[in-house]
């Protein structure tokens, strides 16, 4: 299965609310910042933004004072799982990033999608990739 298929079928899929809602954008990005696959709506990001995210996984709390920046958008960092998941909030939307052995699984949402729904979609794929040794 191609990485794009994972994005299209497992991240940008209808959320299990039976109303046809889905994430706004999603991507799978290597730890080095290279994009493996992304939705057409995923923002262009700067290398330093991805470096900051990777630093926060290695040094939890690194992004808390400055916020998480991706594609020029600033998210307030909220509770996550140290070294495994970073969550951010901006207005009525937000972002979830799950770290696997080789990649970052990223999902961005806006209402009516909830933070919990985004977390479920992103972390389910991230956990699967971890189980596969990826």
UniProtKB/Swiss-Prot annotation:
UniProtKB keywords: Actin-binding, Allergen, Cytoplasm, Cytoskeleton, Disulfide bond, Phosphoprotein
Coiled coil: none
The keyword Cytoplasm belongs to this UniProt entry's keyword annotation: yes
PROSITE patterns reported for this sequence: PROFILIN (PS00414)
Disulfide bridge partners, by residue number: 13-118
Other notes: The variability of the residues taking part of IgE-binding epitopes might be responsible of the difference in cross-reactivity among olive pollen cultivars, and between distantly related pollen species, leading to a variable range of allergy reactions among atopic patients.
Gene3D superfamilies membership: Dynein light chain 2a, cytoplasmic
One Gene Ontology term, aspect cellular component: cytoskeleton
Quaternary context: Occurs in many kinds of cells as a complex with monomeric actin in a 1:1 ratio.
Motif (Involved in PIP2 interaction): 84-100
Subcellular location as annotated: Cytoplasm, Cytoskeleton
Role of this protein: Binds to actin and affects the structure of the cytoskeleton. At high concentrations, profilin prevents the polymerization of actin, whereas it enhances it at low concentrations.
Family under the similarity heading: Belongs to the profilin family.
CDD domains associated with the record: PROF
Modification after translation (UniProt): Phosphorylated by MAP kinases.
Protein name per its UniProtKB record: Profilin-3
Alphabetical list of InterPro entries matching this protein: PFN, PFN_euk, PFN_sf, Profilin_CS
Annotated GO MF terms: actin monomer binding
Residues recorded as bearing Phosphothreonine in the entry: 114
PANTHER family found in the cross-reference section: PROFILIN, PROFILIN-5
SMART domains, alphabetized: PROF
């Amino acid at each position: 299965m191609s990485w794009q298929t994972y994005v299209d079928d497992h991240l940008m899929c209808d959320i299990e609310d039976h109303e046809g809602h889905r994430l706004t954008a999603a991507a799978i990005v290597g730890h080095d910042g290279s994009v493996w696959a992304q939705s057409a709506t995923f923002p262009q990001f700067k290398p330093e933004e991805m470096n900051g995210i990777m630093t926060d996984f290695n040094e939890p709390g690194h992004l808390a004072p400055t916020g998480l920046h991706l594609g020029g958008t600033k998210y307030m960092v909220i509770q996550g799982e140290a070294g495994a998941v970073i969550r951010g909030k901006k207005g009525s939307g937000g972002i979830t990033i799950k770290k696997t052995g080789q990649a970052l699984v990223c999902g961005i949402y806006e209402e009516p999608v909830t933070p919990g729904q985004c977390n479920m979609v992103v972390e389910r794929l991230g956990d699967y990739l971890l189980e596969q040794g990826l």
